[in-house]
Each structure stands twice: as C-alpha cells, then as structure tokens.
C-alpha cells in the first residue's frame, strides 16, 4: 500500500470516528458536518470526498458492525450450541450493539437499515448475521429439530426483524421478558409438528 493510500485510509478513519461520535451525541439528522470535520482535523470538502452523504457514514458503520457481530456469532456457533441458545446469543449481540452505539445512533442505524431510500453500499451487503443464523436453523432442520417446511433464511430474517423492532420500541422493564418470549415463540414456530 502506498503512503498516499495509507494517508487516505487514516483520514477516512478519523472522519468515521468523528462522525460516529457526533451521531451518538445528536443523531444523524442533527449532526453538524462542520463539527465532524473540525474534530477530524480536515477540510469541509474532505468529508464529502470520503462520504457523499451522512447516510454513507452509517452504511460504513453498518458493514463494520455486522461483520463484527457475525464474527462473534460464528465463533459462538462453532462451539456447538443448540438453536435456542443461538437465538438467545443473537439477541445479546443486537442489544450489545445498542449499548455500543447509544440510543440515538442505534435508532438511526436501524432506520437506515430498513430504509427504502438508503444509498447503495459499495461492496453490497450480504447481512452475514442473517446468513449464519439461517445456516444454524438449517442444521437444526437437517437434524430433525426443525419442521421440514420451515424456510431457514426466512425464519432468520423474521427473528432478527423481531429483535430490532422490540429493541427500538420497548423500554427496559418490558424488553427482557418480550425478547425471551420472542425466542420461545420462534422456537415454537419452527418446531416439528407431530
């Protein structure tokens, strides 16, 4: 890698860090690009060179967070945990993301995640957490633990959508119980019908 490329990547990282901090503080819509570039120590136009819009910052953050969660989830699955434990771990990972991002940024993150007007991401997005959970459901299906008519990837999507919805719409006293029930109901919905 050339010195120029190294410097470009370092600048992008500084901008991403400064933007993430500003988004946590104010939310994406209210974030001030001037404050972001001042914190990163770069010219105003440099932000738009690296990130054409503030939404592009969230896309980069989304990719990194999904990759991080998928790596952790993959290591967890490699230890041979059962399906119910895997679903519970997925809940834990999403709630951990909320703690790391903070309430404002987490809501922006999910709003962009499901937005029909979201910008196209550069490398595409394979939603690796969904794929890993779908594969785990498929393994349970092959072992006779999940109904043969269940579509594993659809069940993974439905489950994760449920987590996201409950995470942004419920408060702490109710949330734990609702998420535990989501795991139970998901297991019940996939059970082999005798």
Give short role names for the model-derived ranges.
Residues 11, 65, 69, 87-90, ...:
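Hydrophobic/aromatic residues within well-ordered alpha-helical segments
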